[in-house]
């Protein structure tokens, strides 16, 4: 099994080493030498783990099960603190897709069907029982699927030696509990680390020894030795350099010479045929008068060694002694050399001045007791951060170079910032990039307005299609299994809640009931007004009457995202129009909470709109259940409602499957808003409208089109955005969204509306003078919010308009959900004999042109019959 991990397994530790006394299994020091550790994070342990990472995120390579964390911000904070990889619930993947391979799904069980949840970032299968009946099928399918990387965690009490063999057959990386491991000889009930390593390494020597490269903390090779299972065990037990002499048995490095080693890390190479020991070397490694068997140290390690030696023994009054004792001198020299480096011109000059700067900087570090390894660890730690400043120059250094604070924003690249880039460029101040439409090309502006790239459809389909097929074939059983797995609602025995709904499931505070009732009535009024008073009827020519009449779609499915979230607004926006339209069967679908219940707000709305049932599932499985129907879930004719990328992809998939015979409302993408503001706009209002959409997700985009605003007004809006954003609980999500959001400066309302129509926003907010007049210029938008007193929030909840709207530019082709979304229009034709005579010749001629003789004859036979009758 090939892996990029230092060792082909992770060590599972219940609490980070050092935060408690480890009384069983591996010690903190032993775990540190192995490096790769696995933790399960819970809300109550999060702060402890963050403190641990602050001190040890380079010493250890931590992997986390974060399924107990509901907050996306908390998970992002873990990534920023140095988590190498987090394993999340599948429904959290879309919100964390910006973090690429550092986020992977986790599923629980021993079924081969769970393997379909794998993504390009891999998969963690937790709670695997190698004794289960389905384990054999699992092994076979796991080998065929070739998931990379594939992690597997056993059930408690599993036989670890057998489990490792099973993992190897599945090409999986096992997660082994520290409590079941040991470095002691023949400790009953424990598996020796040396046994694990020797079972995977490959030696071509008759004696089975493995070549071992010994390096210092800078990865400088010190020498080549050999290791055995016994020597590795002893090295881990003592945390020292212990190797296998080909002649004299165990070799404790430095036992006689005093040139000892402190063991830092053990790892295998990519082919598992060589070991690497990272050590802190005291004295020399080589028996000759040189630091290592391959020669003396060079470069920065050599300089550090020299400085440490001089610090201990520099003659009093020497220049080196002055540097170590005179902080002002060192500071002045660092400033001097930094300036000389900045003014150097040729490559030779730059190398020369950089070397001088490094010398004085390292002198400053050594004087403070900071090693080169400490500096390298700090660099490595920074490489794992996902929240970063832009790196703009500040204070007197910026002033000296003539750099103004806003210059970096004005000079920002016009290329769109992807979600991947958002994790790399998180500014200290939350601010949108600015573009002056009069100073950039059309191409540059189009690129800046480009929406964030979404996860590839292939990657999403790889996840959802097996789920859809499973539900289609196995019905209720499949839906229940996914609800148990994804929502942890293991107590559920039925995947659906049928009406009438028990009163105890909709117990709510009076103020919540009142708010829902007000919103219900406003939404009902607005959608009822959309009803056609009577069928359309037109006599196109004498005797030819054409009509169009509407009929409700008989069965509709309303998808309501949720689980722990409470989303009565979406239930209202879908359920009320369906009720007004007269749909015979209204089916809600929403993921239940862990106890198997639906939030009472949604049950109450379902009761008010007369819903037939509530499907207790979310994601692709809920969409599939409504599209195909199951033993207990009603098949619907149309599915409506928002969701993440997986829900949207599932809706698209079933709508293209003729076996499902189901329609959907519209394609969907991340939420977005475009605000047009002029000098009359209140900066606080503008900022609040921008942030109301930015908090939806890191892939949301918000656009401000500023009409003839001066620097003071623009700065006031930017200040409000930052101030309000930092007060929000979802501030890190806002940072990700703002990273690909922009302000465009224009001169006129007409110019602003032209840009808006080109962008076709989901939400368009007009905070301008005489906003009502500008509505005439709107050609493409999901919903428009007019004037200073109309925040987008009222449309989301209670005004009456629908909040299920086209995104990602689809407002050019689609309407938002409305009454027409729940009805279909049927046309009819009613001809008299005179009418057929009037239109018959035209019909027959066109049928003749298209060579459809039966069509022509259907008219000619009737006309001949008329002639004979006369």
From Swiss-Prot:
Residues at the catalytic site: 762-763
Taxonomic path: Eukaryota, Fungi, Dikarya, Ascomycota, Pezizomycotina
Record-given protein name: Histidine biosynthesis trifunctional protein
GO cellular component terms listed in the entry, alphabetical order: cytoplasm
PROSITE patterns noted in UniProt: HISOL_DEHYDROGENASE (PS00611)
Annotated catalysed reactions: 1-(5-phospho-beta-D-ribosyl)-5'-AMP + H2O = 1-(5-phospho-beta-D-ribosyl)-5-[(5-phospho-beta-D-ribosylamino)methylideneamino]imidazole-4-carboxamide; 1-(5-phospho-beta-D-ribosyl)-ATP + H2O = 1-(5-phospho-beta-D-ribosyl)-5'-AMP + diphosphate + H(+); L-histidinol + 2 NAD(+) + H2O = L-histidine + 2 NADH + 3 H(+)
CDD domains: Histidinol_dh (cd06572), NTP-PPase_His4 (cd11546)
Cofactor comment: Binds 1 zinc ion.
UniProt keyword annotations, A-Z: Amino-acid biosynthesis, ATP-binding, Histidine biosynthesis, Hydrolase, Metal-binding, Multifunctional enzyme, NAD, Nucleotide-binding, Oxidoreductase, Zinc
Native source species: Neurospora crassa (strain ATCC 24698 / 74-OR23-1A / CBS 708.71 / DSM 1257 / FGSC 987)
Gene Ontology molecular-function annotations: ATP binding; histidinol dehydrogenase activity; metal ion binding; NAD binding; phosphoribosyl-AMP cyclohydrolase activity; phosphoribosyl-ATP diphosphatase activity
Effect of residue 44 to K: In strain: FGSC 541
Region (Histidinol dehydrogenase): 368-870
HAMAP family attached to this UniProt entry: HisD (MF_01024)
SUPFAM superfamilies the UniProt entry points to: ALDH-like, all-alpha NTP pyrophosphatases, HisI-like
Database matches in Pfam families: Histidinol_dh (PF00815), PRA-CH (PF01502), PRA-PH (PF01503)
UniProt similarity note: In the C-terminal section; belongs to the histidinol dehydrogenase family.
EC number(s) recorded for this UniProt protein: 3.5.4.19, 3.6.1.31, 1.1.1.23
Location of the region described as Phosphoribosyl-ATP pyrophosphohydrolase in the Swiss-Prot/TrEMBL record: 286-367
Keyword hit for NAD: yes
């Amino acid at each position: 099994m090939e892996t990029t991990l230092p060792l082909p397994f992770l060590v599972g530790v219940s609490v980070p080493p050092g935060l408690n006394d480890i009384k069983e299994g591996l010690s903190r020091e032993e775990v540190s030498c192995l490096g790769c550790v696995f933790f399960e994070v819970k809300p109550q342990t999060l702060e402890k783990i963050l403190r641990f990472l602050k001190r040890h995120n380079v010493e250890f390579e931590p992997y986390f099960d974060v399924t107990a964390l509901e907050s996306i911000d908390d998970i992002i904070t873990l990534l920023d603190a140095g988590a190498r990889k987090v394993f999340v619930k599948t429904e959290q993947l879309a919100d964390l897709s910006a973090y690429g391979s550092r986020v992977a799904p986790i599923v629980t069980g021993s079924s081969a069907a769970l393997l379909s949840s794998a993504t390009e970032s891999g998969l963690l299968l937790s709670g695997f029982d190698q004794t289960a009946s389905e384990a054999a099928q699992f092994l076979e399918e796991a080998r065929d699927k070739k998931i990379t990387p594939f992690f597997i965690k056993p059930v408690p009490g599993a036989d670890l030696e057998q489990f490792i063999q099973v993992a190897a057959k599945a090409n999986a990386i096992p997660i082994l509990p520290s409590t079941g491991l040991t470095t002691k000889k023949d400790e009953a009930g424990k598996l020796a680390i040396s046994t694990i390593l020797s079972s995977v390494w490959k030696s071509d020597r008759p004696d089975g020894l493995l070549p071992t490269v010994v390096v210092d903390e800078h990865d400088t090779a010190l020498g080549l030795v050999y290791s055995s299972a016994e020597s590795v065990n002893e090295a881990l037990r003592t945390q020292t350099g212990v190797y296998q002499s080909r002649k004299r048995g165990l070799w404790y490095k430095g036992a006689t010479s005093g040139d000892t080693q402190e063991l830092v890390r053990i790892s295998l190479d990519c082919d598992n045929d060589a070991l690497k020991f990272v050590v802190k070397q005291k004295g020399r490694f080589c028996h000759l008068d040189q630091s290592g068997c391959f020669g003396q140290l060079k470069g920065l390690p050599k300089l550090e060694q020299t400085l440490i030696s001089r610090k201990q023994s520099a003659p009093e009054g020497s220049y080196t002694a002055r540097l170590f004792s005179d902080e002002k001198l060192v500071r002045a020299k660092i400033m001097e050399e930094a300036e000389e480096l900045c003014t150097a011109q040729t490559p030779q000059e730059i190398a020369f001045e950089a070397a001088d700067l490094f010398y004085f900087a390292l002198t400053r570090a050594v004087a403070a007791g900071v090693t080169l390894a400490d500096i390298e660890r700090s660099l490595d730690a920074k490489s794992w951060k996902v929240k970063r400043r832009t790196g703009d120059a500040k204070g007197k250094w910026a002033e000296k170079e003539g750099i103004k604070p806003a210059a970096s924003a004005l000079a920002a690249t016009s290329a769109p910032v992807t979600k991947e880039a958002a994790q790399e460029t998180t500014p200290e101040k939350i601010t949108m990039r600015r573009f002056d439409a009069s100073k950039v090309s059309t191409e540059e502006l189009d690129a800046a307005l480009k929406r964030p790239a979404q996860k590839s459809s292939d990657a999403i389909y790889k996840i959802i299609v097996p789920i859809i097929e499973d539900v289609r074939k196995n019905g209720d059983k499949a839906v229940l299994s996914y609800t148990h797995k994804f929502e942890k609602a293991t107590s559920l025995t039925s995947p659906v809640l049928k009406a009438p709904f028990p009163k105890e499931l909709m117990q709510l505070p009076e103020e919540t009931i009142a708010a829902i009732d007000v919103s219900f009535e406003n939404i009902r009024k607005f959608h009822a007004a959309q009803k056609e008073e009577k069928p359309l009827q037109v006599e196109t020519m004498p005797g030819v009457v054409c009509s169009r009449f509407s009929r409700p779609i008989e069965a509709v499915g309303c998808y309501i995202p949720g689980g722990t979230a409470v989303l009565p607004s979406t239930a209202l926006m879908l359920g009320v129009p369906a009720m007004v339209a007269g749909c015979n069967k209204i089916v809600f679908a929403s993921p239940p909470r862990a106890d198997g219940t639906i939030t009472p707000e949604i049950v109450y709305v379902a009761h008010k709109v007369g819903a037939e049932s509530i499907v207790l599932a979310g994601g692709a499985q809920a969409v599939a259940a409504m599209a195909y129907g199951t033993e207990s879930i009603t098949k619907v004719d149309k599915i409506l409602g928002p969701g993440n990328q997986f829900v949207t992809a599932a809706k698209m998939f079933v709508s293209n499957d003729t076996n499902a015979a189901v329609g959907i409302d519209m394609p969907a993408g991340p939420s977005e808003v475009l605000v047009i503001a002029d000098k009359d706009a209140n900066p606080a209002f503008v900022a609040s409208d921008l942030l109301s959409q930015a908090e939806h997700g890191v892939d949301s985009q918000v656009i401000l089109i500023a009409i003839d605003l001066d620097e003071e007004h623009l700065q006031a809006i930017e200040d409000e955005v930052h101030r309000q954003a930092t007060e929000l609980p979802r501030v890190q999500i806002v940072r990700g969204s703002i990273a690909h959001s922009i302000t465009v400066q224009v001169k006129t309302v007409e110019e602003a509306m032209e840009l808006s129509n080109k962008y076709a926003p989901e939400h368009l907010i007009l905070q301008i003078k005489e906003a009502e007049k500008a509505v005439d210029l709107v050609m493409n938008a999901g919903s428009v919010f007019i004037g200073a007193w109309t925040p987008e929030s009222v449309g989301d909840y209670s005004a009456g308009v629908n909040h299920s709207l086209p995104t990602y530019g689809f407002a050019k082709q689609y309407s938002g959900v409305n009454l027409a979304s729940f009805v279909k229009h049927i046309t009819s034709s009613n001809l008299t004999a005179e009418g057929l005579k009037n239109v018959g010749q035209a019909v027959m001629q066109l049928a003749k042109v298209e060579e459809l003789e039966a069509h022509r004859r259907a008219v000619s036979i009737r006309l001949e019959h008329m002639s004979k009758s006369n």
